[in-house]
Amino acid sequence: VKKVGEASRDAARVEVPFEFIMPPRDQWWTGSAAKGFEVAIGRAGATRRQLFQVGRGTAQHALVAGKTGSGKSTLLHALVTNLALTYSPDEAELFLIDFKKGVEFKMYADRRLPHARVIAIESEREFGLSVLQRLDGVLRERGDEFRRAGVNDLGGYREAKPDVKCPRILLVVDEFQEFFVEDDKLGQEAALLLDRLVRQGRAFGVHVLLGSQTIGGAYSLARTTIDQMAIRIALQCSDADAQLIFSKDNAAARLLTRPGEAIYNDGNGAVESNSLFQVAWLPDDRREQILLSLRERAAGKYPPPLVFEGSAAADVAKSVPLSALIADANAVAGPPVVWLGDPIAIREQVKFAFRQESGSNLLLLGQNEEASLALVTAGLVALAARYRTPESRFVTVFDGTPDDADTAGVLRNAANALGLPDAVVPRTEVATALTGLAGEVERRARGETDDRSPRFLFVHGLHRVRDIKKADDDFGFGKRDRVAGPGELFARIVRDGPAVGVHVVAWCDTLHNLHRAVDRD
C-alpha cells in the first residue's frame, strides 16, 4: 500500500524545467526595468509562460501564500534567479529577508549574488526592521531627487537622466508575519513602514513581495495594507487562507492539489483574474551553477551584499575596516578602535573607540568564554595592526584561562603570531606588571612625561586573576600608611588611566564576580 501511495504521488507530480522560463544566455542582463519587472516564473497551460509583472498599473506588490511543502520556496527561487538573469545589477536590486529557521537564501549569500544588496538568513526582527528603515530612506532620497529632476516616477527619471543609475528594487520577505509575533513597538513600526512602502513605493521603483505559510490569525499585516497588494499568488493552503488571499467569492485556491501548482492573480483576488500555472523547478545544483556564472559575469564590478545570518557569529576576517587597517596602518584615523562584531541592523560594524577621557575602558561581561576570548583576540589583532612596533610595550595581557582548559595558550599563540611575544605576562609577574603600569599612569598624570601614546591592559578572566582581586579585609582604613596592593593599583589604572592614554579591556563571567574582584567605583 505504501509503494502504491508513493507511486501515485510521483505520478501526480508535474515538473517544469527551469530552462523553459530562463532567457537564452545571449539575452542575460539585457532587460530594462525602467517601466517595471517582467519575469517568467512557471508554465501556464501547455506552452505559455506565466509572467510575474510589477510596475504597471495597480500591479505593484505581491502576496504569496502556501503551506509547508506547497512549493513556495521553489517559487521564490525561480523568481529571484530568473530576475537576476534577465536584469543586470544596474537595473535590479534585491533585498532578501528570510525569517524561517532555514537557509533558503544562504546560497545567494555564499555565491555573492551581484543584484543582492541585503540578504538576511534566519533573520532577527530587529534586522528586518532596519531593512525596512533603509528602504524608507530610499523613498525619501528618491523623492528629493525626482523633485529636483521635475519627474513623478522612476520611468520619468530614467528618461530625464539616462546616464544616472537608478535600479528598480524588489524586497522579498519570507514568513513576514514574524514581524508581528509580539505586540510591541517594533511590530508597530514594521507595520507602518510596510504600509508606507506598499503605498508609496510604486512611484519610486520599490516593490514588495511578502510570503507566508498562512496570512490569517492575529500575527499578520493590517488588512488595509494587504488590500494595496494587487498581485496574489496562492499555492496549496488552508481553506481560511484561500479566502483571505483572494476575494470571498474566489475559492479556487482550495482546489490546488500538488506541490508547485499555483494561481497567479493580479486583480486583488477577483475570480476573473485567476491564472493557473505550475512553478518552474530549479534544482539546487543548477541554481548554484547559474549563480556562479552570474558572479563571473559581474567580475567584481558590484559590491558584495550585506549578509546577516542570525545563527552565525560575526566573522572577523570579513570586517571591511579591519581588513583596510591590516592593509594600511594609516587607513583608520582618530583614536584606537577595536571591532566587536556585526550589528543587528544596516549600519557600520559595532566598535569601541579608546578616547583619552575618563571611563574609556571596555568591560566584557558574560559566561560564554569562547565568545569573550574571540573578542579579546580580535581586539589584539586590531591594535597590533594599528601600532606596528617591534616592541610589545603598548599592550599587556593577563590571561586567566585555566591551564587544563581547551583554550589555554590561545592568547599567547595569538600574541606571538602578531609579533607581541612579551605581551602575555606570567601569573607570577602580574603584581610587578601592575606596579609598572600604575607608575606610568601616575607619571603621565603628574606631567613628568610628555608620552601619551596609547597603552592597553587586557585582562581575560578578571575573576580568575588572584592578584587583581580586592583584599577581603580592605575596609579603607589607614591607606596612607601602607603600600598599595595589586588590586588597588589595578583600580587606579582603571580610574585614572584613560585620561592619560592607558586603557583596560577586561572580561568577567558574572556581575557578582565582578563586584567581588573590584570595587564598584
Regions found by a protein language model. Give the residues of each.
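Polar low-complexity intrinsically disordered regions enriched in Ser/Thr and small residues
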Residues: 8, 153, 158-159, 313
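Extended alpha-helical interface modules used as scaffolds for assembling large macromolecular complexes
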Residues: 6-23, 284-340, 347, 382, ...
